[in-house]
């Protein structure tokens, strides 16, 4: 950076401090990742200056011939990655992508079947504090109390009983593979639309390491960050028959001008996904999550469902006598960033919780391998089991520092 340090030292210093935080801490928030320098360059380009309401070839502003090229590249690459018939890359977020699907096919008060937030769902899947739960009549399904896997028979029974217009699959804190074929069969049985929110697993789907929902779902939404390792944003994939309605729901329905600099960054990240080494990255994300899970098990720490099939691990802290709120703070103090998270049938309040959620997408981008994740699990065990012992916590800090120094981040940024 050449101009920002001179123009606005306050903002520059905050950015520099965040750069330092990312370098010196271990990032285990499952919804975060580290984009490449190329993605950051695209997002910081002159495209931030351009208004482009509408879609390629049908804009409400002149001078869009070059941003049209960029948006077409993003759409075509997404189609190639996921085998989708129609793609909209304009949603500013995953939440807005979900909203657009709802606005396309639902009326106020329609019944929708979605996953309980405390069982691993998402706010936009019917939480009463979210527009989705206010606007529509959401019925919740969840996981089996014993296995902590999605209870597909419960999904079917509720679908038959409530006859939803839409069934939503996908989660923000579910560590197991989702059977989209079963969901499709249930949706067909009751005549419902089927939508999948694959925000957390999109990168794993892209690499062929998780079943692809596109052949089964009428609509698939996702964020473009998380395991997909792009800029923060959203995307919708759907059958061609719904394409025009989806596009209208985004613009002019719920958004104005698209963020063309972000769409450029999406295009670049999609290009990276199409490269051969992305599959290796995604394989490492999963193997690292399994290494972390095994290490935590060795520490005697209980995991929801006993382990993981994807990029995240959900920790049940009750046997340690800790809440998620306390554990998040303890780990942050030693240099590990995580988030408190509800577990299925959680007795604690949402701002307290009985669990923490850990993910390996970001540390894998940084170069952490299985041995490093085994060490991370051991450090977490040390800190949580001795959270009131300052000597043990200092040992944990030193071990975190050794790992972050071994795997540097953004070495060429220059600030």
Swiss-Prot record:
Membrane-spanning segments: none
Compartments, as annotated in UniProt: Cytoplasm
Alphabetical UniProt keywords: Amino-acid biosynthesis, Cytoplasm, One-carbon metabolism, Pyridoxal phosphate, Transferase
Reactions listed under catalytic activity: (6R)-5,10-methylene-5,6,7,8-tetrahydrofolate + glycine + H2O = (6S)-5,6,7,8-tetrahydrofolate + L-serine
Superkingdom of origin organism: Bacteria
Gene Ontology BP terms: glycine biosynthetic process from serine; tetrahydrofolate interconversion
Residues bearing PTM N6-(pyridoxal phosphate)lysine: 226
Pfam families, per database record: SHMT
Role this protein plays: Catalyzes the reversible interconversion of serine and glycine with tetrahydrofolate (THF) serving as the one-carbon carrier. This reaction serves as the major source of one-carbon groups required for the biosynthesis of purines, thymidylate, methionine, and other important biomolecules. Also exhibits THF-independent aldolase activity toward beta-hydroxyamino acids, producing glycine and aldehydes, via a retro-aldol mechanism.
Family stated for the protein in its record: Belongs to the SHMT family.
Subunit (UniProt): Homodimer.
Protein name (Swiss-Prot/TrEMBL): Serine hydroxymethyltransferase
Annotated source species: Bacillus velezensis (strain DSM 23117 / BGSC 10A6 / LMG 26770 / FZB42) (Bacillus amyloliquefaciens subsp. plantarum)
Gene: glyA
């Amino acid at each position: 950076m050449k101009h920002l340090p001179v123009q606005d030292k306050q903002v520059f210093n905050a950015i520099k401090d965040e750069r330092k935080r990312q370098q010196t801490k271990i990032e285990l928030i499952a919804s975060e990742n580290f984009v490449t320098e190329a993605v950051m360059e695209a997002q910081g380009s002159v495209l931030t200056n351009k208004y482009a309401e509408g879609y390629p070839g049908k804009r409400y502003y002149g001078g869009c011939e070059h941003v049209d090229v960029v948006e077409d590249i993003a759409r075509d690459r997404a189609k190639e990655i996921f085998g989708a018939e129609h793609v909209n890359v304009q949603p500013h977020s995953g939440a807005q992508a979900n909203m657009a699907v709802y606005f396309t096919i639902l009326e106020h008060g329609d019944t929708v079947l979605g996953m309980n937030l405390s069982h691993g769902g998402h706010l936009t899947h019917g939480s009463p504090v979210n527009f989705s739960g206010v606007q529509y009549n959401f019925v919740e399904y969840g996981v089996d109390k014993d296995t902590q896997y999605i209870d597909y028979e419960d999904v079917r029974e509720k679908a038959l009983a409530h006859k939803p217009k839409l069934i939503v699959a996908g989660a923000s804190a579910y560590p197991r593979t989702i059977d989209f074929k079963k969901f499709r069969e249930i949706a067909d049985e009751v005549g419902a639309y089927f939508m999948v929110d694959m925000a957390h697993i999109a990168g794993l789907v892209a690499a062929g390491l998780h079943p692809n929902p596109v052949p089964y779902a009428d609509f698939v939404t996702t964020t473009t960050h998380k395991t997909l390792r792009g800029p923060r944003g959203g995307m919708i994939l759907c059958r061609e028959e719904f394409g025009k309605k989806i596009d209208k729901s985004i613009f002019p329905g719920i958004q104005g001008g698209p963020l063309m600099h972000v769409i450029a960054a999406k295009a670049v990240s999609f290009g990276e996904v199409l490269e051969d080494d992305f599959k290796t990255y995604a394989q490492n994300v999963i193997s690292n999550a399994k290494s972390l899970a095994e290490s935590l098990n060795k520490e005697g720490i209980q995991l929801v469902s006993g382990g993981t099939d994807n990029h995240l691990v959900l920790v049940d802290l009750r046997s340690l006598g800790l809440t998620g709120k306390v554990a998040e703070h303890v780990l942050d103090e030693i240099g590990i960033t995580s988030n408190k998270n509800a577990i299925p049938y959680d007795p604690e309040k949402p701002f307290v919780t009985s669990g923490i959620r850990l993910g390996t997408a970001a540390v894998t981008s940084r170069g952490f391998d299985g041995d490093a994740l085994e060490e991370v699990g051991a450090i977490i065990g040390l800190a949580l089991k001795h959270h009131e012992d300052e000597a043990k916590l200092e040992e944990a800090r030193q071990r975190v520092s050794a790992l972050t120094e071994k795997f540097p981040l953004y070495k060429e940024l220059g600030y």
